[in-house]
Amino acid sequence: MFVDSVELLISSGKGGAGAISFWTEKFVIKGGPDGGDGGRGGSVFFKVDNNTDTLSGLRGRNHIKAENGRPGEGRKKYGRKGQDTTIIVPPGTTVVDMETGEELLDLVEEGQVVKFLEGGKGGLGNMHFKSSTNQRPTYAQPGLPGITKQVRLEMKLIADVGLVGYPNVGKSTLIATLSNARPQVANYEFTTLTPKLGVVHISDYDSFMMADIPGIIEGASDGRGLGLEFLKHIERTKTLLLMIDAANYREMKYQYETLLVELDRYSETLAGRKHAIAITKIDSLSQDEVNTLTQTFLDDIGLKANDTLKKYKADMNYLSYGFKTDFGVPLPIKEPLFVLPISSVAHLNTEALRYALGDFVKNVKEETEAEEK
């Protein structure tokens, strides 16, 4: 089961107490202090592991605690350090302080290890408190307490392409068609209640990750429907595929503008994501009807149909649009990279979409890397 958020009480270990002890030996009547120091308490670490894809393994573990340090002993023996605890999380996990709402950690990179809570320091044994006026001190320090925090772990999916659209627009069917994912598919709204990931293969050596995310509705950024949960998950997707239902009673321009408004209201970062458009369910209409709707939509958003997507073997009997990429020409931000009518059920233009998205992801990655240099 997918769990995208879990609340935990996390504590580092308490430091061990310093020992009060005096040297004992035959013929030694009053030996000096020899109490050793207590061991440091165990620390708590977070580690990012690509082999973990949910937070479900942490469910039920209400209190995660590192081991306390052991107390010191006589003969100046130090107490053993408490054992550290490492919490394994998937990439894309954030750690939020439940008391303040502050985001404490953002765990993204595979293999990343971060110390979260330091263990308490061990107390000093009485051997440290001998002085000229006190040869046999009877005092040793207690260990310092560990640190406890109430946190919420949130997992935000990291995918190359996030599918965005109204409920029942065909996201689950598309991801099942293009990838190895098998999301629940049915003809009613909010079939997808939790995000799903699928790997879309371009070749034996090339692939990208696609996220099927719960449908968006007007007011999603205010928390209506599954809105805020949905938007939280697409924050990290690198590109967006906006899906518009050709058979929906809402006109396509309205669907498109609603999606853009909700993205913009929720996050400037999301509003700046590069996107493409798939016009779905064209098998339920005639070719002429689809072309009429597509032409109207392109006119409404100021674009002209062209044959740019022919290189991906798109069916040219259907109108489509593709941005003509060229070396040194930045990808568009406010307009779609391409507009392609598809039918996942009839497998119409789905292979063209696969390869167009593959190039889209590649181009965005190259552009991002160039900007970071």
Curated annotation (Swiss-Prot):
Which residues does the annotation say bind GTP?
165-172, 190-194, 212-215, 280-283, 343-345
Basic and acidic residues bias: where?
64-76
User: GO terms for biological process?
Assistant: ribosome biogenesis
Localization, UniProt: Cytoplasm
Q: What is its main location?
A: cytoplasm
Offer one Pfam family short name for this entry.
GTP1_OBG
Q: Can you tell which superkingdom this protein's organism belongs to? A: Bacteria
User: Which GO molecular function annotation, any one, does this entry have?
Assistant: GTP binding
Q: Which SUPFAM superfamilies does the protein's record reference?
A: Obg GTP-binding protein N-terminal domain, P-loop containing nucleoside triphosphate hydrolases
Cofactors:
Mg(2+)
Q: Which PROSITE patterns match?
A: G_OBG, GTP1_OBG, OBG
The protein's UniProt keywords, in alphabetical order, are:
Cytoplasm, GTP-binding, Hydrolase, Magnesium, Metal-binding, Nucleotide-binding
- Binding sites annotated in the UniProt record for Mg(2+): 172, 192
Residue ranges of domain OBG-type G in the record:
159-362
Q: Where is the Obg domain?
A: 1-158
The EC number(s) attached to this protein equal 3.6.5.-
Q: Where are the annotated segments for Disordered?
A: 62-83
One GO CC term on file = cytoplasm
Question: What is the recorded function of this protein according to its Swiss-Prot or TrEMBL entry?
Answer: An essential GTPase which binds GTP, GDP and possibly (p)ppGpp with moderate affinity, with high nucleotide exchange rates and a fairly low GTP hydrolysis rate. Plays a role in control of the cell cycle, stress response, ribosome biogenesis and in those bacteria that undergo differentiation, in morphogenesis control.
What is the protein's quaternary organization? Monomer.
Q: Which family does it belong to?
A: Belongs to the TRAFAC class OBG-HflX-like GTPase superfamily. OBG GTPase family.
Kindly give the PANTHER family that the UniProt entry links to this protein: DEVELOPMENTALLY REGULATED GTP-BINDING PROTEIN-RELATED (PTHR11702), MITOCHONDRIAL RIBOSOME-ASSOCIATED GTPASE 2 (PTHR11702:SF31)
Q: What is this protein called?
A: GTPase Obg
Could you tell me which species this protein originates from?
A: Sulfurovum sp. (strain NBC37-1)
Designated gene of the protein: obg
